[in-house]
Amino acid sequence: MKIHDFKIKKQEQKKISMLTCYDYPSACIVAESNIDCVLVGDSVAMAVHGYPTTIMATIEMMELHTQAVARGLGKQFLITDLPFLGHKSSQGHTVENVKRLLQAGAQAVKIEGADKDTCQTISHLVNAGIPVMGHIGLTPQSIHQLGGYKIQGKNSEQAETLLQQATTLEQAGCFAVVIECVPQDLAKTITDSLVIPTIGIGAGPGTDGQVLVWHDMLGLQTSFNPKFVKKYFRAKDHFIEALNSYVQQVQQMHFPANEHSF
């Protein structure tokens, strides 16, 4: 998938599939699938490193995981999250952070929020030739300001703000916008108001595409079960079964067998 395909898919009403990915083996699997695009999300801080929030993701962490994923991917378009405060200190600092991610293999960056400074930064990056994906609704990097993980845009004032944010991000030059944890009717309204595509997570079926976290949709963990996640596989159960089978065969001296020995 190329950058221009995002808008083409919206025009042709073809849904966009996006999935997070954090390491080389997983990227190699994704490369053989029909997934359109991959996000090296700052959710790696939680899903892989065990931190309680995405705030703990650093530019070094994002750079390392981007390098690993880029080495394994094939035709999929690769986007990397700019981590917490990665675009807040100065434009020069932001450009340097983005440069590191692009040199690591990202083809675009995703930036959370739509305040005036953020939109100016996005516009600056786009004018420099860097593709930027926006992100509105529940923005995990602002989780303390939002008062926790909860649905955004539930009243008319919040809904109008989100609609304006989406429009502002489009005007700033974003090629797509993620809408997270927003009522489906509002997400559909935002989607219909934009020329650029929307990618939803917890935003209903009316967006131009969907994104899920690798570990969530494959059932690699069972402690986090938000309503918007569908588990397409029960990987954790199968992994535990395989591990216990290995232990049993070692104890019973069924492994290694002759075919595993020299």
Curated annotation (Swiss-Prot):
Q: Which InterPro entries match?
A: Pantoate_hydroxy_MeTrfase, Pyrv/PenolPyrv_kinase-like_dom, Pyrv_kinase-like_dom_sf
Q: What species does this protein belong to? A: Legionella pneumophila (strain Lens)
* Name of encoding gene: panB
Q: What family is this protein classified in?
A: Belongs to the PanB family.
Q: Where in the cell is it found?
A: Cytoplasm
Q: Which domain of life is it from?
A: Bacteria
Full protein name? 3-methyl-2-oxobutanoate hydroxymethyltransferase
Q: What is its pathway?
A: Cofactor biosynthesis; (R)-pantothenate biosynthesis; (R)-pantoate from 3-methyl-2-oxobutanoate: step 1/2
- The catalytic site is made up of E180 (proton acceptor)
Checking Gene3D superfamilies in the record gives:
Phosphoenolpyruvate-binding domains (3.20.20.60)
Please describe what this protein does.
Catalyzes the reversible reaction in which hydroxymethyl group from 5,10-methylenetetrahydrofolate is transferred onto alpha-ketoisovalerate to form ketopantoate.
Record-listed E.C. numbers: 2.1.2.11
**A single GO BP annotation from the record?**
pantothenate biosynthetic process
